[in-house]
Amino acid sequence: MSEAGGGKKPPVEPQAGPGPGRAAGERGLSGSFPLVLKKLMENPPRETRLDKEKGKEKLEEDESAAASTMAVSASLMPPIWDKTIPYDGESFHLEYMDLDEFLLENGIPASPTHLAQNLLLPVAELEGKESASSSTASPPSSSTAIFQPSETVSSTESSLEKERETPSPIDPNCVEVDVNFNPDPADLVLSSVPGGELFNPRKHKFAEEDLKPQPMIKKAKKVFVPDEQKDEKYWTRRKKNNVAAKRSRDARRLKENQITIRAAFLEKENTALRTEVAELRKEVGKCKTIVSKYETKYGPL
């Protein structure tokens, strides 16, 4: 007999049913899973062990660095940071704190005048001072870098006291006024004592007697002496009188010349001083107006 289509049908394989071998394999896998997990926990992979060792080393380094910084800061001053400020790059913000409360909490003395001037200080500034003092603790000159408000206050007070002190009186003889005075050299020679220093009209001083008016002296009447009585004694006395009269005339002329040149210089100096005083009065008037405006606006000084 021939089949339809002229082909042969493939043989049908028998389906494997749930036999006893497959069930035994599944039970073996489920039983070996706890053993594998236990081995992994006892002997972790190499990468996990390296990460744990690195974390432990980093933690030990941080602890040793913190202990060293605390030891350095303890050598300079008592520890003042009991709490650390977290810093993650975004949530860090500068905050202001009360300096008085901060000093009282940490037992640090401070000058009241300095506290009155600087009541609030930023935390970053205080932290910067602490880090600078701890980093420079090894050299002996680091103690001079610590801020000492008491010394600065005393120095400012001493400078203010020096400014308030009245200046010492000035000798009027040492004061020189710029005066365009150029006397004739011949007049200076005539006003100088022969054989002495050249007369200086700027610094020369006269005695009170020299500045007093001189009385007019009447000349004595001439007495006629005949030639028979003009003996040697007469001529000696007459020569002495002539020399004395010449000396008195020369001294009087010298004094008159000195007074004349000195008076000319004083007149020019007086004119220069008057102009200077006028300028000073203008400046003082301006200062007075400024002070009066300030007092009317803000009250008396």
UniProtKB/Swiss-Prot annotation:
Residues 1-70, 130-174 are annotated as: Disordered. Changing residue 218 to A: 30-fold decrease in affinity for prolactin recognition element. Residues 233-253 are annotated as: Basic motif. Changing residue 273 to V: Diminishes DNA-binding. CDD domains: bZIP_HLF (cd14695). Residues 131-158 have a biased composition (Low complexity). One of its GO terms (cellular component) is nucleus. Transcription factor that binds to and transactivates the TSHB promoter. Binds to a minimal DNA-binding sequence 5'-[TC][AG][AG]TTA[TC][AG]-3'. Binds DNA as a homodimer or a heterodimer. Can form a heterodimer with DBP. Belongs to the bZIP family. PAR subfamily. This is Thyrotroph embryonic factor. The gene is Tef.
